[in-house]
């Protein structure tokens, strides 16, 4: 699974995609301006999904505890592209270590400095650069900064021969967000490391068909 992590006002890592709570709660404002207690008082998307009317914004620790027994791999995106939360890298690394999941976590971010910082904190961790625009010699750039993978946008890899270049780099290549069947089949056939999608059931079925 892929999830996004930010810090509350009191420095607790929470799992939420947007930098604000406007879209998913009845309140407005930045995640960073609410304490964990204040966020826990809110319900998430209760009007859109009444069957989950008690849903809350989870902490990263809660999510790791929930998936730990499953053996599933977790891709943690550090949401530091707009606001770089102080010490988020260390806080997240500490929680992953506490959960005993160091071997099952991938760290990624659009803020490449944040990923480089994570690599300094946990040199053995698997890391990847997220990006949507063209970065010249991106594979060389990743290797020179000791980063292990590339996470480009699907519309990016469809341009020119970028995918061929990335696959030839021996770096892990995970493409986002792949929601179209044709794109899924193309990338699975190309043997990318993984695809990031909102429709995992569809992707799993296409992968099974490709392996049949």
Where in the sequence are the language-model features?
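Residue-level detector of family-conserved "landmark" positions at structurally sensitive sites
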Residues: 2-3, 77, 106, 152, ...
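Conserved metal-phosphate-binding beta-hairpin within the catalytic cores
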Residues: 1-7, 13, 76
């Amino acid at each position: 699974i892929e999830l996004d992590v930010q810090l509350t006002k009191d420095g607790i890592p929470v799992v939420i995609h947007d930098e604000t709570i406007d879209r998913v709660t009845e309140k407005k404002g930045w995640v960073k301006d609410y304490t964990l207690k204040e966020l826990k008082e809110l319900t998430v998307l209760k009007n859109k999904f009444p069957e989950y009317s008690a849903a809350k914004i989870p902490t990263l620790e809660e999510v790791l505890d929930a998936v730990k027994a499953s053996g599933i791999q977790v891709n943690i995106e550090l949401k530091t592209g707009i606001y770089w939360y102080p010490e988020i890298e260390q806080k997240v690394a500490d929680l992953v270590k506490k959960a005993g999941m160091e071997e099952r976590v991938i760290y990624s971010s659009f803020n490449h400095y944040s990923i480089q910082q994570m690599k300094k904190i946990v040199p053995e961790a698997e890391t990847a650069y997220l990006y949507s625009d063209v970065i010249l010699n991106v594979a060389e750039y990743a290797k020179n900064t000791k980063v292990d993978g590339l996470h480009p946008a699907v519309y990016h890899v469809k341009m020119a021969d970028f995918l061929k270049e990335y696959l030839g780099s021996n770096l892990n290549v995970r493409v986002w967000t792949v929601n179209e069947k044709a794109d899924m089949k193309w990338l699975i056939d190309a043997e990318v490391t993984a695809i990031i999608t909102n429709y995992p059931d569809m992707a799993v079925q296409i992968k099974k068909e490709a392996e049949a």
